[in-house]
Amino acid sequence: MKHFGPKEFWIRLTERFQADDVDYEEWYKNHKPTMEELQRQRDTEFEYEPLISILVPVYNTPEEFLKQMIQSVRKQTYGKWELCIANANPANETVAEILRISSTKDERIKVKDVPENEGIAQNTNAALASAMGDYIGLLDHDD
């Protein structure tokens, strides 16, 4: 920066670290845990096992995204969690059915219908109202 100034420094920095330079698939292949490692994680018992409340506001979430999000939480190796979902459009029958089936299959999944979409902050607060955890995590419905 001393030799080129802030503008040239920024240009050189951004040219050097482009998102295209990061091959996520390659990185994931090199860092993906083995089945044995995942089982070891599941079998690990901690002295303190806090309940993690994961808050997710949903509103007309595409079916595949919603299913993948729920499945990704269910596959966590740490089992002391609850998924608190605030459904801001209960009239969407597809979303409502996915949530009903998921919460029936796994009691850690709690669904609260929000009568009217009040935006992400208020919908998240609706999910928070059903949370019982020691810690809170936030997750987007399409993650």
Locations of regions flagged by a protein language model:
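Short alpha-helix within the catalytic core of nucleotide-sugar-dependent glycosyltransferases
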Residues: K67-Q71, A96, N125, G133
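Short aromatic/hydrophobic "clamp" motif used to bind/position activated sugar donors
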Residues: I136
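N-proximal low-complexity "stem/linker" segments adjacent to membrane-targeting elements
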Residues: F4-R74
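Residues that form or flank phosphate/diphosphate-binding pockets in enzymes
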Residues: E64-F65, E93-T94, Q122
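Acidic donor-binding segment of Leloir-type glycosyltransferases
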Residues: I70-E116
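The conserved acidic donor/metal-binding loop of glycosyltransferases
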Residues: D140-D143
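Glycine-rich, basic loop-to-helix element that forms the pyrophosphate-binding segment
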Residues: V114-A131
